[in-house]
Every structure is written in C-alpha cells, then in structure tokens.
Amino acid sequence: MNKVVVKNVTFGEGAPKICVPMVGKTVAALKEEAEMLQTIDLDVVEWRVDFFEDVKDLAKVEAALGEIRAILPETPILFTFRSAKEGGELAVSDEFYFELNETLAGTGKIDLVDVELFNEEADVLRLIETAHKNNVKVVMSNHDFDKTPAKEEIVSRLTRMEALGADLPKIAVMPKSAGDVLTLLDATNTVFEKANQPIITMSMAGTGVISRLAGEVFGSAMTFGAAKKASAPGQIDVNELRHVLDLLHKQF
C-alpha cells in the first residue's frame, strides 16, 4: 500500500491519525479555535468551511484561511465544504462548490481537500487535477446519514474513489444496529487488504464509536475527534481518543 505523507504526518502506517474539525462561524471564532488546537495532541485540522458565515465570499475565505495557517503553520489542514446533501450546513450550487474548492486548492495554504464522490465525474476529475498540481492531497468522501449500505456497495464506493485518483478515500455511514457496524468494519478490512491507497472509514453515532477506535485493526487511516463541538454524531473527545488509540497501538 502507498503511504500518503502530508507535512510531518504519514497516513497508512501506525495508529490512525487524529483529525479535529474547526467549526467557527467567524474569523474571531476560528482564530480562537486554532489557538486552542495548538495545545492539543492532534495530527490534522479540518476546516469545515460550510460553518463559516462568509463562505460565499472567496476573498474572505482565503483571508480566514491565512489566519488559521498563521496560527497552525506546521499542522496539515484539510479544507472541507460539506454539502447539505451529505450533512453539511449550507446548500450551494455545484458550480459554487467546485469554484470554492478549486480556488482554495490553488492558494498554497491547504494540504488536503475534501471532494465528494457523488458529483459530475468531469467536475470531480478537474478538481482532483487542480489539487494535485498544487501538491494538495484529495480526501474523496461519501456520507450516508440514513443507513449503512451493503458491504458490496461500501467496497464499490471506496474502490471507485481510488480509481478516480483519490489519495485518501473516505466513507461514513449510519448504523441502525451492531450488525451494521460489523458490515462497515468488514468492508473496511476487505478494501484495506487490496487497496493501493490508505482509506478512512467510520460508522457514526454511539453505536459506531468502536469503528472510530479500531482503525489500526481493520484498516482505517484516520479518525475524527472533537475538541470543542462535534461536527458529526459519535465524535469522541480528542484527548480520550488519543489515549485509546495509543492503548490499542501498544497491543497491536
């Protein structure tokens, strides 16, 4: 399997890397969050830009990103606009979604960009090309807040993401039972055994918490923890998360 190196973080080896979302609505709130995150043992910061009140002004988005980068110069930043259809805060046009991501990928201020799988393939491929030209890694994602698809469907989506050029394919699904969590873990293990790229998977909500902890066993390279406000159901406090991941890593 290929390793994916972003600054001083290597995906695809050792314990899952910890990503903490920033969800501030204003520049002041984001700066406060970034300063707090300086003190936390994390690997990646995700800016959930769909929470930002000035997201439709690209110049203000870039300026806010500059403020975050100044506070966290060595921390990998994942730039994510989560669409409303996949659980995000704001509905926007496809045109705006791609303009935002392509523009910010070209600023030199982000390290990874989230690209949602279920868009026009030509648009997805163009954004991947733009990201890679600017040395930005692509987290290609899909989120199902209603259910856990069949194992074959989860495997198919992750495999398709890799085929399209994702550096880190990602899927998050909602369990209705413990069996659904096992389905996600089984699919993760199946893809991990044959994939060329590290993958990121999780089963959400309380039932799925084990999937956020057991990535090193089943093959998920990153997990999401909450420092201030969880951006998705089931995210664990980042300090508790690090403790459990370290515990499992020592035994593995």
From Swiss-Prot:
Gene3D superfamilies in alphabetical order: Aldolase class I (3.20.20.70)
InterPro entries: 3-dehydroquinate_DH_AS, Aldolase_TIM, DHquinase_I, Type-I_3-dehydroquinase
Enzyme kind, highest EC tier: lyase
GO biological process: 3,4-dihydroxybenzoate biosynthetic process; amino acid biosynthetic process; aromatic amino acid family biosynthetic process; chorismate biosynthetic process
UniProt entry keywords in alphabetical sequence: Amino-acid biosynthesis, Aromatic amino acid biosynthesis, Lyase, Schiff base
Active site: 143, 170
UniProt-recorded Gene Ontology molecular function terms: 3-dehydroquinate dehydratase activity
Pathway this chain belongs to: Metabolic intermediate biosynthesis; chorismate biosynthesis; chorismate from D-erythrose 4-phosphate and phosphoenolpyruvate: step 3/7
Pfam families according to UniProt: DHquinase_I (PF01487)
Superkingdom field: Bacteria
Similarity section: Belongs to the type-I 3-dehydroquinase family.
HAMAP family found in the cross-reference section: AroD (MF_00214)
Oligomeric and partner information: Homodimer.
PANTHER family xref list: 3-DEHYDROQUINATE DEHYDRATASE
Protein name in the entry: 3-dehydroquinate dehydratase
Protein's organism: Listeria monocytogenes serovar 1/2a (strain ATCC BAA-679 / EGD-e)
Taxon lineage: Bacteria, Bacillati, Bacillota, Bacilli, Bacillales
